A protein has these predicted regions:
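Conserved AMP-binding/adenylation subdomain of ANL enzymes
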Residues: 203-222, 232-316, 325, 350
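Conserved C-terminal "lid"/linker of ANL adenylate-forming enzymes
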Residues: 452, 477, 485, 516-554
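AMP-dependent adenylate-forming
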Residues: 10-33, 189
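Conserved AMP-binding/adenylate-forming
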Residues: 30, 46-90, 226
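Conserved pre-ATP/AMP-binding loop-to-beta segment of ANL
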Residues: 148-184, 191, 216-222
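Conserved ATP-binding/catalytic segment of the ANL
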Residues: 380, 394-395, 399-454
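Conserved AMP-binding A3 loop
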Residues: 33-35, 171, 180-206
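Structural core segment of the AMP-binding/adenylate-forming
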Residues: 10, 51, 78-157, 485
Length: 554
């Protein structure tokens, strides 16, 4: 049986080992060293203890990525409380529901969230703490009020001759099955569930990253945190892995627009990049593809002798756009556009596509860029098993199942959902459909809930149709829905490009109809679109930038 060490002991060891190293920077702001983080953790432990927080109590966090968020999260775990990270992009009503459902005792909030929420809607909370300076937004107990008012005094009394590394001693989880955090799903299917992740899941994800990716990372290497830390993809691979490895994490404390991200890449020059497809696709489509459409470039790319050299030069330029210092870019969280992937593969760009789920904290599949099979999402990750429920897994898609220490304990207060997701043998049923080749590479076809049934009984995977549609002229993104036995394409045009081209609304409509005809010309009869509709606004998305499909299929 696998021996799993204490995760909190790893946090403690990393702090002691890297005491004077830079670890957390708010981009264009403050930088904390490990000893600064340790002091903040200790102060929060004193606050928790003196305000009556018990081991196992729930502490929620909701705010943009920041060093203060990271310290509050680490303090929660190492105190023995259960963290409840909440995506700051959730609506106030969603935040109230999660805080109330999780039985949270305290809530840490960022500056924006603090102005949007109403404490009366969360009656069981004992207090709301302001993340930037840990001041109290709300206190419902005298103990909490007193503890915060006298926090510096109590810290000084406990450590009269300065706080040193020998003082660092954290709560160690009693067993790997102990609950570490509850992470509420992004709500892609319209219903958010509380995923209970044990310490073994945090350890297993961190051990995978340190073992497989960590051999290319050195102490002091830099990483930019782009994804929300309240999402397990960002939490595991842009924060916890790096913190345990002695790396330096930069937080984009503002909304990470493409311009801000591009500037941060140039300034920080990260060693590893974790991204959702949308970020990569926007940079490639806006910064790279237009340069390849000139007559000169088209001519050069069609000359076999020169083609290789041109692709190498293009690869250099694309690599430079991402800082020029990374070992590889790991893409995950949503489907990757095939046109963009084909381009990156052709120029020899160092990328790979992984696969995961909140319920696995998150990793399920991964392959290093050097062994990555194009179009796949890699093989079963370290510590995990993966199988396809299909009579012919190589050719007939079936549900993807996974088993291993990453898998959740269950859904908080939802035994029915837990039984539906985890079978008696411990396999987690992902709800995703895919195939697996002889080498173990997994190819995702779509969500089983999204699969459409054609009039002739043929299975239709809308994600595959959308990938093709989104590569057509002037289409920024798309969703395919079914009305009766008809398929309809909802297309959101690239209005920026249309403006540059001087197109009128009627021109855009004509182009979209032409796209439909061109699409149908190369598709089998059961997958053809009977109509297209223009979606004026961008499709609403989850924080990991996958479209909330359920909003458009009703």
């Amino acid at each position: 049986m696998m021996e799993i060490p204490s995760f909190n002991a790893l946090i403690e060891k990393s702090i002691i080992d890297h005491w004077d190293s830079d670890v957390l920077t708010d981009y264009k702001g403050i930088t904390l060293q490990y000893h600064d983080v340790a002091r903040k953790i200790e102060k929060l432990h004193i606050l928790f203890e003196n305000s009556g927080v018990q081991k196992g109590d729930k502490i929620a966090l909701c705010g943009r990525n920041s060093s203060a968020w990271a310290c509050a999260f680490l303090a929660t775990l190492t105190y023995g409380a259960v963290a409840v990270p909440i995506l700051h992009e959730f609506t106030p009503d969603q935040i109230y529901n999660i805080v109330n459902h999780s039985d949270a005792k305290l809530l840490f909030v960022g500056d924006v969230v603090a102005t949007q929420i109403d404490g009366t809607k969360m009656p069981a909370l004992e207090g709301i703490v302001y993340l930037p300076d840990y001041s109290l937004v709300l206190s419902r107990t005298d103990k909490l009020t007193y503890a915060r008012e006298h926090l510096n005094e109590m810290f000084g009394h406990k450590y009269p001759k300065y706080f040193r590394k020998e003082h660092v001693s954290y709560y160690k989880e009693q067993c790997p099955e102990e609950l570490a955090l509850i992470n509420y799903t992004s709500g892609t299917t319209g219903f958010s569930k509380g995923v209970m992740l044990p310490y073994r899941s945090l350890w297993s994800n961190a051990d995978f990253a340190r073992t497989v990716i960590g051999k290319h990372i050195a102490v002091g290497d830099k990483v930019i945190s782009i994804l929300p830390m309240a999402h397990m993809y960002g939490m595991a691979f842009e924060f916890l892995f790096e913190f345990l490895s002695g790396c330096h994490v930069y937080y984009l404390t503002r909304i990470p627009s493409p311009a801000i991200i591009a500037q941060a890449f140039a300034d920080v020059r990260p060693r590893i990049i974790i991204a959702v497809p949308l970020i990569i696709e926007k940079i490639i489509r806006k910064k790279v593809f237009p340069k390849l459409q000139t007559n000169k470039m088209r001519l050069l790319l069609n000359m076999p002798v020169i083609n290789k050299k041109v692709n190498e030069k293009i690869c250099e330029q694309v690599t430079a756009a991402f800082g020029g210092n990374f070992y590889e870019i790991i893409i995950g969280g949503a489907a990757f556009n095939q046109e963009v992937e084909n381009f990156l593969n052709r120029i020899g760009f160092r990328y790979t596509v992984g696969y995961g789920a909140t319920e696995c904290g998150p990793i399920i599949c991964y392959s290093d860029y050097a062994s990555f099979a194009k179009g796949s999402c890699g093989r079963a990750a370290l510590h995990q098993e993966v199988r396809i429920v299909s009579p012919d897994p190589e050719n007939v898609p079936g549900e993807i199942l996974t088993k291993g220490p990453n898998v959740l304990l269950g859904y908080y207060k939802n035994e029915d959902a837990t039984r539906a997701a985890i079978d008696e043998d411990g396999w987690f049923h992902t709800g995703d459909l895919g195939t697996m080749d002889a080498e173990g590479n997994v190819f995702i076809k779509g969500r089983s809930k999204n699969m459409l049934l054609g009039s002739n009984g043929q299975n239709i995977y809308p994600e595959e149709l959308e990938d093709k549609l989104s590569s057509m002229p002037l289409v920024a993104e798309s969703v395919v829905i079914q009305k009766g036995d008809k398929l309809i394409g909802l297309l959101h045009p690239d209005y920026d490009e249309a403006k540059v081209m001087g197109l009128k609304p009627s021109d855009i409509e004509s182009i979209m109809e032409q796209n439909r005809q061109d699409f149908n010309a190369v598709m089998p009869a059961y997958a053809r679109l009977s109509a297209v509709r223009i979606q004026e606004e961008e499709f609403e998305k989850t924080p990991k930038k996958s479209i909330k499909r359920y909003l458009y299929t009703e």
